């Protein structure tokens, strides 16, 4: 919270749903108290969640649209491999099949995940230690140019970093050298974003409406977009000013190591979050950032939140045809896509 100059929220936000607008739009969400149990009793929590979902739907089946979110499955994929969870996924399939058959052909169903999972055994990235060894202070408020604040969002493959604006580039120089760091992203003075690795630098710009994008890189191309722009130019799909359309970039990068990177970075820079981070850090597979207390309870076999494909790409299936690849914002029901400002 920049106005109060302190980190607010924490684990209780997840449990309470406070200041999480999308939860208010759901007809079913895993109860807050139940979101604390999966790391202690994952399978029992999961099957209980399926039962609550089934009961809630049958009580509200007359609604024209029923929106549900199963939160326990996220924890399951942090703790187990996909192969280990196959019976649990089949149980979910049975619940959905039962609901669908009860609709007697009059019910449409859309299932999707909101992200992927690296499925790589993961450990904490020593970012805090790295910064402190280089003279930075990791704390809950920002007073001086060497102060850094990094909220803990669970255990995920990214870190949101807050600092004094004048310290951004120097801090980015330090972050790219930290163990486990893959990409460092921050807004630049040209109105776009700079993407850094330890061996390369990229600059991304976009038009006001987001329909056109420009990209350049020096050293090793951090987003692997130069080859994409070169191919689009050869196909005559770049404008005279060297920009690529948003649609062309999505089509060309949806299956890349960094899926749809231009739009995802642009959305970070322009999205509805009031207290946007000064720097985003995307971690390599095998690393996470977050509340360290969880590391003493369980071993993580995977996580999500990073830019790379396994953490990013989810699935979607439905009773109506879907395209081979689609952004989540284009997939979600209209009832869900009402934007609200949040802190």
Across the structure, where does each feature detected by a protein language model lie?
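Active-site neighborhoods of enzymes that stabilize oxyanions during catalysis
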Residues: 147-334
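Loop/turn elements at helix/coil->beta-strand transitions in domains of secreted/extracellular proteins
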Residues: 62-64, 105-108, 180, 276
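Short, solvent-exposed loop/turn segments at secondary-structure junctions
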Residues: 71-75, 116-118, 285-289, 322
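Short secondary-structure boundary/capping segments
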Residues: 81-86, 122-132, 200-202, 296-298
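His/Asp/Glu-rich, glycine-adjacent segments
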Residues: 1-87, 91, 212-258, 276, ...
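Metal-dependent active-site segment of extracytoplasmic phospho-/sulfohydrolases and closely related
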Residues: 92-127, 280
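Acidic, His- and aromatic-enriched active-site or binding-groove loops in soluble protein domains
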Residues: 1-10, 86-98, 127-144
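Short helix/loop capping segments that flank catalytic or ligand/cofactor-binding pockets
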Residues: 76-78, 120-121, 128-141, 170-171, ...
């Amino acid at each position: 919270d920049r106005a109060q100059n302190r980190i607010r929220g924490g684990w209780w936000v997840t449990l309470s749903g406070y200041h999480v607008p999308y939860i208010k739009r759901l007809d079913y969400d895993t109860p807050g108290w139940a979101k604390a149990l999966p790391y202690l009793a994952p399978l029992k929590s999961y099957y209980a969640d399926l039962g609550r979902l089934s009961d809630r739907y049958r009580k509200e089946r007359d609604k024209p649209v029923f929106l549900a979110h199963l939160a326990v499955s996220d924890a399951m994929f942090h703790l187990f491999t996909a192969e280990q969870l196959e019976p649990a996924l089949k149980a979910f399939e049975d619940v959905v099949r039962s609901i669908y058959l009860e609709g007697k052909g009059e019910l449409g169903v859309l299932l999707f995940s909101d992200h992927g999972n690296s499925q790589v055994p993961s450990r904490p990235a020593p970012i805090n230690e790295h910064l402190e060894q280089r003279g930075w202070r990791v704390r809950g408020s920002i007073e001086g140019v060497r102060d850094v604040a990094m909220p803990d969002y669970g255990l995920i493959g990214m870190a949101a970093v807050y600092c004094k604006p004048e310290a951004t580039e120097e801090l980015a120089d330090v972050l790219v050298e930290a163990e486990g760091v893959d990409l460092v992203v921050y807004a630049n003075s040209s109105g776009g974003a700079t993407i850094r690795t330890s061996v390369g630098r990229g600059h991304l710009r976009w038009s006001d409406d987001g329909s056109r994008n420009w990209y350049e890189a020096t050293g090793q191309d951090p987003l692997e977009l130069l080859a994409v722009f070169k191919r689009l130019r050869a196909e005559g799909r770049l404008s005279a000013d060297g920009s690529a359309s948003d649609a062309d970039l999505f089509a060309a990068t949806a299956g890349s190591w960094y899926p749809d990177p231009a739009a995802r970075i642009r959305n970070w820079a322009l999205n509805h979050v009031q207290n946007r981070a000064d720097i985003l850090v995307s971690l390599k597979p095998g690393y996470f950032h977050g509340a360290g207390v969880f590391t003493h309870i369980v071993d993580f076999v995977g996580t999500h939140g990073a830019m790379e494909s396994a953490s990013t790409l989810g699935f979607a299936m439905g009773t109506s045809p879907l395209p081979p690849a689609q952004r989540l914002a284009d997939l979600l029901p209209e009832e869900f896509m009402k934007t609200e400002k949040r802190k």
